[in-house]
Amino acid sequence: MLCEDGQWVKNKKSFKNQGKKQGNMSPEEKLQLIKRNTQEIITEEELIKLLKTKKKPTVYLGTAATGRPHIGYLVWAIKMSDFLKAGFHVKVLLADLHGALDGTPWPLLEKRYKYYEKVIPLLFKAIGTDIKELEIVKGSDFQMSKKYYFDMLKFSTEVSINDCKRAAAEVVKFGDNPKLCGLIYPIMQALDEVYLKADIQYGGVDQRKILMFAREFLPKVGYKQRIEVMTPLIPGLIGAKMSASDPKSKIDLADDEKDVNDKIKNAYCEQGIVQDNGVLAFMKYVIMVVKQDNGEKLIIERPEKFGGNLEFNSYEEIEEAYTSKKLHPLDLKNAAAKEINKLLKPFRDEKAEIEKLSNEAYP
C-alpha cells in the first residue's frame, strides 16, 4: 500500500504511442507504455499474455490514509495514467483501514480519508489525464464484509508471524514493540487484489516484499496470483527517500510558490552528481514525462552572459548536460521550481477547501 476531472493531453510523438487512441494500440505498444520508468514487473511474460487476451484489464494502486500526500505521489499518478492510456480500468484504493493499521489515530481516520479523497483526483488533473476509466474506492466499503473477514482469517492460517513481519517491514512502522495490526496489514493488501478484481497491483519498489507475499500465499487460499508492477522510489530533497513524515525531504501539495522555491533552492543538488539527487529524479520521473507526452521541450532560462537559454527534448539530454557540468545546479533548480509550481496549480485553485480539510486531518 503506498505510504476529477482531468482533460486528455495529446502527445506529439515524443513517446510514440501516446498520440494513438487506446483502441488502436497494439499489445506491444501497450507493453512499452506500461514498462516506461518501471523498475520491476513480476512477471513480464504474464503481462504480455494479459495484454493479448483481455480487452480491458484492471490495475489497482492502494494508498494508505497516513501522512499528507506530497509531490512524490505524482510518480504513481503518471504510471496510473500510462495504464489508463493503455486501455486499463484503473482503481485507486484509498485505504482508510490500512491507515489505522499503520498508526493513523482512529478519531482522525475519516478526516484523513476526506483529505485524500479531495487531493488524489487533483494529481491526475495536474498532469492532464483523462480519468473517465478511473475508479476511487474506499477500503472500508468492502473490507468490513463477512466474506472478506472470513478470507482474512483463512489467510492467517497459512502464514506465520515471520512471513507477515518480513512482508511489511519496509512499509509498516513496527518500532521496538510491534503491534499485531502491522501483521494484519500485508494479509489485507494481498486480499485487496482479489476483492478489487485486479489483474495487476502497482506500487513502489518498497512494496516488493508485500507483493511477493501476495503471489506466494494467495494460491494457498484458493485465489490466483496477480501481476505486480513496481516503480523506483525517488530521492527526497535532502538526498534520502521522499517521505510524508519529513517536511524537509518533500514538497507538500499545498505548498505555495515561495515554499516551493525555497525548498528547491535548499535541496541537495551537487554539481555533476546524479545519485541521490531529488531534483534530477523529479525531472526524470515527472517533469520530462509530462513534457514529452505533451510534445513539449523543457526550456531552462539563463542570461545571455551565461550562455543563454537551454532547450531539452528528453531527460537523457538533461542528465548528460548536468554530468558534464554544462548545466549548473542553480539553473536546474530554477527550472524545476518553475515546472513544479505549474503542476501545483490545480491544488492552489482549491486552496481554501484543501487547507480546511488539511487542518482537520492533521491538527
Regions found by a protein language model. Name each.
Residues A190, L196, R208-P363:
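Conserved nucleotide- and phosphate/pyrophosphate-binding catalytic cores
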